C-alpha cells in the first residue's frame, strides 16, 4: 500500500458526528462556559479525560495556579436618562463590565461628562472613541466612573474578555456603539445622568491541563503534539456563553485526529495530546506545559487548533519557533486535502510553544459570536470540522512518514 492510499484511508475515518457530539457536550448548560477554575471547567475536564479510550493511553492532569480571574458575580443594573426619559440598559448587549473595572457592587449615580474636558467630580465620564482608557484616567479625580465604547457582534452582543489590564480605581462600564453615541451626545450638551454598578471580583483559582500520551516516540522518530484549549470565558449571571467555536471545535478536532492517528502512525512515531486550560486568561496552561517540555529536553512538533467553526475562504496558519519543516508538511497536507491555507494571526497557545523554542503551528478557521452568547453549536459548520480534522491527520501522517512528495487527489496547482 502506498503512503497516498494509506492516508486516503485515514481521512475516510474522520467522523463529523463524533466531533459534533464533543462540541455539543462542551457547550452544554451544565458546563457553564468552562471558565478556568470553575465547576463547569472541572466538569468539562472530567468529561474529556473519559474520551481517551485508546489501549495503553497514559492520561493525566497537571494543575497550575491562576491569579485574579475576573468574574461578574451579579448582573449589573444600569440606567441612564436625559430630560424626562429613563432607559434601563440590557446587560450583555447595551452594557457590560470592563475587565479593568474596580469591584463596585453598590449603584453610583452621577451626571454625565466628557472625559478630559469636564469637571470629573461625582460624574460618569464618557470616554470618546478615539481616547484610550489610559488617557481617560489622566483627570478622574473623584469621578463616579468611566463609560467606554465597545463594538458588538452581528447579533448585537458585546464580547467578554478575561485577560487584560490590572483593575483601576474606578468602575468602568462598556457601552454598545449606539448607546455610547447617545450618552456622549448628552454629555457634550451638558445633560443626562447615569446610575450603575460593577460587581466584578477577581478569584485566585487552579487550572488543570489534560495530557494523554498515545504513542511514545523512538529516539529518532517524529514526536507529534496536538493541542487545543478547552476553557472558555464562562457564563455570566443570566447570560450563557457556550464557547462552541471557541474552542469546543478545536478540542473536537484534536480528539478526532488523535483517535484516527493513534493506531495508524508508523512504528517509532510519537503522538501526544494536550487539552489546555487557562488560554482565555493569557495562555497560562500552554506556558506551564511548554516550560515542562523544555525542562525535560523534549522537542515535539506542535499543532494547535483554535476556533474552527466556519471556514470561509482559507484556514489561517501562524508558525512559531523552528517550524519551517512543519509548515512545509502542513502546506503539502493542505494541497492534498484541498484546504486552502493563508498566513494569518492565530493568537492562541501555539505562541507559547513557539516562544519556548518548539516548532509550533496554530490553525484557525473562523467563528461566529466571539466570546458571546451567539457562540452556539448550531453555528458550527460540520464541513469545517471535517476539513480541519483531515488537515491535522494529513499533516501528522506526513510528519511521521516524511515522504518527499505525496500525490494529491486534486493536483498541486492552486
Task: Walk through the language-model features, giving the residues of each.
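Extracellular/luminal Protease-associated
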Residues: 15, 85-171, 337-338
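Extracytoplasmic/secreted proteins, especially bacterial periplasmic and envelope-associated proteins
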Residues: 18-21, 25, 43, 47-50, ...
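Active-site-adjacent substrate-binding region
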Residues: 165, 310-414
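Acidic/histidine-rich catalytic neighborhood of metal-dependent amide-processing enzymes
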Residues: 206-209, 232-326
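Noncatalytic luminal/extracellular "stalk/propeptide" segments of secretory-pathway proteins
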Residues: 10, 21, 29-124
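N-terminal capping segment at the start of a domain
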Residues: 3-39, 55, 60-63, 154-169, ...
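Soluble metallo-hydrolase cores and metallopeptidase-like ectodomains found primarily
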Residues: 98-112, 159-243, 259, 263, ...
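Second-shell loop/turn segments in exported
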Residues: 5-13, 30-39, 54, 102, ...
